[in-house]
Structure formats: C-alpha cells, structure tokens
C-alpha cells in the first residue's frame, strides 16, 4: 500500500488545548553532542525537576530508542539519518500533545537537526549544544565506547572515525567541561521554563 492512501487523522484535542491545560507551551529541546558529553544525564535531571514542578515532560534517549523503535538501524550515515528522522517524527507527536520533549542524541549531522527543526512550528525546536572536548569525553567514557572505538571494535564512532558537526547557532550551549552537572541541569531547566511561558 502506498502512502497516498493514508490520511492524517486529526486529534479531537488541539495542541492549544493541551497547552492551556498544562499551563505551558510544548516544544522539542534537542540536546546534541559527543558521546560522554552529558546529554542523557542533563536531560533526565532536568526532566525530573520540571516534572516535579508540574510540567508535562518526557525524555527520548538515544540508547533507549535503539533498544526498540530503532533497533533495526546501525551506525552508517544513512542509518544515523533515519534514526534522527524517526525521533523527530516521534518528538513532533509529543509536541502536538502539549508535551515538552527533551531529546538526548549525538545527532552528528547539522542537516538532520535542521530537518527536525522544520517538522514543528517556529519557536518549538530548541537546539542545545552539550559542548565537551573530545579528550574530556574520552576520559569520562562511561560506557567504555571510546576505548572500543580506538581499538577498532566499534566502526563509525562519532568523534573518532565519524565526524560530529557542531551546531552553527544553537539556542543554548552547555559546556560540560566547564559547568558542573548541577549547573548544566539548572541552566537547561531555567531555559525551558522561560521558553515554555
């Protein structure tokens, strides 16, 4: 069956109605950065604080999504693009339901992030660059991935033998080589609360 026979089904509840009930705007908070930069840690800590303050929030994490929805994808450039495309579409559905979606994905290519930005309305996508020098990420190496990549056990590893394209103009930069975990989380929480008004 081709897509031409599939019709979009509008929800009986509008995004505006969800936002009014939640008392905040929805949007995508897209954390991007190298493995080990702190994306997942910051995303989950910020989500916890926002949730405790009454915000409708969810986290989409790169590793978790690859256990289910994207378990069929590898790490070639094409598979990485498809990974981000799928996540963008899922995040868009959450935005339409009035939710603040915090994503934690390496998402190494600028073009892929640009495409996700275009899925939602202006002002609903917020690119957050979780900046951290490669050597610091390698020192942290919480999953032992850099060591494996350096030993040739993991091909196409971002930062080692696959490029990472830093955001040209992110809405927020969290330099986790300089900021503590708590400082990074608080800056993100403050940013989200300001944009969700």
Curated annotation (Swiss-Prot):
Coiled-coil regions listed in the entry: none
Primary enzyme class: transferase
UniProt-listed GO biological process terms: hydrogen sulfide biosynthetic process; sulfate assimilation
A UniProt-annotated Pfam family: APS_kinase
Pathway field: Sulfur metabolism; hydrogen sulfide biosynthesis; sulfite from sulfate: step 2/3
Entry's Gene Ontology molecular function annotations: adenylylsulfate kinase activity; ATP binding
Active-site residue list: 107 (phosphoserine intermediate)
Domain of life: Bacteria
Bilayer-spanning residue ranges: none
InterPro entries for this protein: APS_kinase, P-loop_NTPase
Keywords, sorted A to Z: ATP-binding, Kinase, Nucleotide-binding, Phosphoprotein, Transferase
Entry binding sites for ATP: 33-40
Catalyzed chemical reaction(s): adenosine 5'-phosphosulfate + ATP = 3'-phosphoadenylyl sulfate + ADP + H(+)
UniProt-listed Enzyme Commission number(s): 2.7.1.25
Cysteines engaged in disulfide bonds, as pairs: none
Record function comment: Catalyzes the synthesis of activated sulfate.
Assigned protein family: Belongs to the APS kinase family.
Record's protein name: Adenylyl-sulfate kinase
Organism: Bacillus pumilus (strain SAFR-032)
Recorded name of the encoding gene: cysC
């Amino acid at each position: 069956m081709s897509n031409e026979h599939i019709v979009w089904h509008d929800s009986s509840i509008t995004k505006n109605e969800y936002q009014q009930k939640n008392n905040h705007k929805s949007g995508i908070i897209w954390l991007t950065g190298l493995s080990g930069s702190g994306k997942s840690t910051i995303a989950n800590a910020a989500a916890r604080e926002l949730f405790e303050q009454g915000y409708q929030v969810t986290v989409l994490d790169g590793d978790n999504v690859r256990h289910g929805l994207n378990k069929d994808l590898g790490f070639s450039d094409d598979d990485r693009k498809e990974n981000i495309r799928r996540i963008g579409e899922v995040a868009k559905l959450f935005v339409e339901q009035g939710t603040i979606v915090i994503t934690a994905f390496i998402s190494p290519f600028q073009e892929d992030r640009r495409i996700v930005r275009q899925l939602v309305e202006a002002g609903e996508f917020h690119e957050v660059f979780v900046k951290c020098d490669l050597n610091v990420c390698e020192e942290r190496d919480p999953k032992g991935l850099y060591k494996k990549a350096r030993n040739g056990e993991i091909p196409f590893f971002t930062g080692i033998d696959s490029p990472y394209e830093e955001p040209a103009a992110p809405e927020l930069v969290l330099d986790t080589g300089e900021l503590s975990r708590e400082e990074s989380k608080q800056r993100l929480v403050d940013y989200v609360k300001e944009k969700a008004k």
